[in-house]
Amino acid sequence: MSKPALRVAVTGAAGQIGYALLFRIASGEMLGKDQPVILQLLEIPDEKAQKALKGVIMELEDCAFPLLHEVTAHSDPRTAFKDADVALLVGARPRGPGMERKDLLSVNAQIFTAQGRALNDVASRNVKVLVVGNPANTNAYIAMKSAPDLPAKNFTAMLRLDHNRALSQLSAKSGKRVADIEKLIVWGNHSPTMYPDFRFATVGGQGLTQLINDDAWNRDTFIPTVGKRGAAIIEARGLSSAASAANAAIDHVRDWVLGSNGKWVTMGIPSDGSYGIPEGIIYGFPVVTENGEYKMIKDLEIDAFSRERLDFTLKELLEERDGVKDLLK
């Protein structure tokens, strides 16, 4: 007997990331090859965006995905999020020319306040929310604060792209396969201040620091390369990373729903006060996932360099939080 379909809401559905994401969700890559889905797609009310969304839906229909039971187009989050089991908040206002970061925060605060309220009112009480649109951590924080009737743990931000980027760099440096590297962490904000940390990472049971014992490379090459990878892709491609971002979103939700099989993964989650990170801040932490729940890896040793990096990325998150505080009243 087939499973009941899960409702997946996606915002910014006609955008670059949306286009790279939707077909993979509909094929079963995110929720399982035996899990039917209903896609509820949100775009801004603008006529051009809605027309583009219609075109994407035509293509989804033309794929004749066996698992895609229904797809609907929306311009109002209150209909798009109705009974949603999973919500991927991809759409966000990008930073325009001459736009200060505080302006970006303010515009996105309005978007994510409205979306948080809509989730609060109409989504499933167990909805799993992943914020992809930047600034992802703070946008997730805004949505969470705007949805007081939903558990805070339902709101997450995407650091999986940074995690995957870091894995790729470590693989290239060590000569080991990406799939064999375990226990990597990316701490903090999804921004260049993040801290990719391979002090606990292993390859086939061996500590990765034994293979890469190079503090200068870690500090001067690895950390900045991971932090600035998005900018490097824009420089090379003329467009921001869309396929890799969509891939990371699928990884994040797949592991959250289906489990990470004991492997550590990075998720931006509300802090419980661990590692000196104030409670409620959405921060990248190492987690394992099973049975639809994530569990933070606790009590890892934080050396002096790591403490400095954790505090550096926290400072940025606190500044962002303070920048939107007045908008959350």
UniProtKB/Swiss-Prot annotation:
Active site location: H190 (proton acceptor)
Record keywords, A-Z: NAD, Oxidoreductase, Tricarboxylic acid cycle
Q: Name one Pfam family in it.
A: Ldh_1_N
Task: Report the EC code(s) recorded for this entry.
Answer: 1.1.1.37
Entry-linked InterPro entries: L-lactate/malate_DH (IPR001557), Lactate/malate_DH_C (IPR022383), Lactate/malate_DH_N (IPR001236), Lactate_DH/Glyco_Ohase_4_C (IPR015955), Malate_DH_type2 (IPR010945), NAD(P)-bd_dom_sf (IPR036291)
Task: Tell me where on the tree of life, at the top rank, the source sits.
Answer: Bacteria
Q: Which GO terms describe its molecular function?
A: L-malate dehydrogenase (NAD+) activity
So what does this thing catalyse? (S)-malate + NAD(+) = oxaloacetate + NADH + H(+)
Task: Kindly report, in one word, the top-level EC class recorded for this enzyme.
Answer: oxidoreductase
Q: Which residues bind NAD(+)?
A: G12, A13, A14, G15, Q16, I17, G18, N108, Q115, V132, G133, N134
Q: Which residues of this UniProt protein bind substrate?
A: R95, R101, N134, R165
Recorded hits in CDD domains, A to Z, give: MDH_chloroplast-like (cd01338)
Q: Name one GO biological process term.
A: tricarboxylic acid cycle
- NCBIfam families noted in UniProt: MalateDH-SF1, PRK05442.1
Stated family:
Belongs to the LDH/MDH superfamily. MDH type 2 family.
Functionally, this protein is described as follows: Catalyzes the reversible oxidation of malate to oxaloacetate.
Q: What is this protein called?
A: Malate dehydrogenase
Tell me the organism. Bordetella pertussis (strain Tohama I / ATCC BAA-589 / NCTC 13251)
